[in-house]
Amino acid sequence: MARVVIMDHPLIQHKLSFIRSKNTGSKEFRELVEEVAMLMAYEVTRELPLVETEVETPVAVAKTKVLAGKKLGVVAILRAGLGMINGFVKLIPAAKVGHVGLYRDPKTLEPVEYYCKLPPDVAERDMIVIDPMLATGGSASAALTLLKQKGARHIKLVVLIAAPEGVSRVEQDHPDVDIYAAALDPCLNDHAYIVPGLGDAGDRLFGTK
């Protein structure tokens, strides 16, 4: 069974408070989402393997450690996932970036794919799927399925806010995928919005509905 990790780091929780606030404008919202994404990237990559090496300092030779050549990929679920991309690639500049476009059918609430562009070597990479919200879990589950169809074997899902319904859906459909969230909120409302959540992340990031 997959792990569900709630990141309670003080900086993440502090910034998340301002992200939630309805009084936070698009510019500040974008900046905060990027900052929290970077903090989450730090935690998500905590278990990357290291190898020992040596470097020459101005004084002497030092024994150090570097990443063991593990290939990483980051996939944003459009459009709101775009707000988290920079936070990840600033910390992991060598990561390849993919995009999956999904929209939620207003009647069925199920995802419909309209775009998919992934690194060609996803089977060789540890993939990180990012999206600010895990509500019903439909979009996340569909994106994870797409990655697996392309050969991805090691995947993590990173979201700002999750609802129990979304967590259950991903656990049911993809029990091998660990979920990382900054917060787990109580429930969804009748419109499948996370309560209390933060509203529509895409609208708030880009100032358009």
From Swiss-Prot:
Domain of life: Bacteria
CDD domains referenced in this protein's UniProt entry, alphabetically: PRTases_typeI
Sections of the chain in a coiled coil: none
InterPro entries: PRibTrfase_dom, PRTase-like, Upp_B, UPRTase/APRTase, Ura_phspho_trans
Top-level EC class as recorded in UniProt: transferase
Activity regulation summary: Allosterically activated by GTP.
Residues binding uracil, per UniProt: 194, 199-201
Reaction(s) the record says it catalyses: UMP + diphosphate = 5-phospho-alpha-D-ribose 1-diphosphate + uracil
Entry's Gene Ontology BP terms: UMP salvage; uracil salvage
Keyword Ribosomal protein: no
Keywords: Allosteric enzyme, Glycosyltransferase, GTP-binding, Magnesium, Nucleotide-binding, Transferase
Keyword Magnesium assigned: yes
Binding of 5-phospho-alpha-D-ribose 1-diphosphate, residues: 79, 104, 131-139, 200
GO MF terms held by the record: GTP binding; magnesium ion binding; uracil phosphoribosyltransferase activity
EC number: 2.4.2.9
The protein's required cofactors: Mg(2+)
Annotated family: Belongs to the UPRTase family.
Biological function: Catalyzes the conversion of uracil and 5-phospho-alpha-D-ribose 1-diphosphate (PRPP) to UMP and diphosphate.
Official protein name in the record: Uracil phosphoribosyltransferase
Source species: Heliobacterium modesticaldum (strain ATCC 51547 / Ice1)
Gene, per the UniProt record: upp
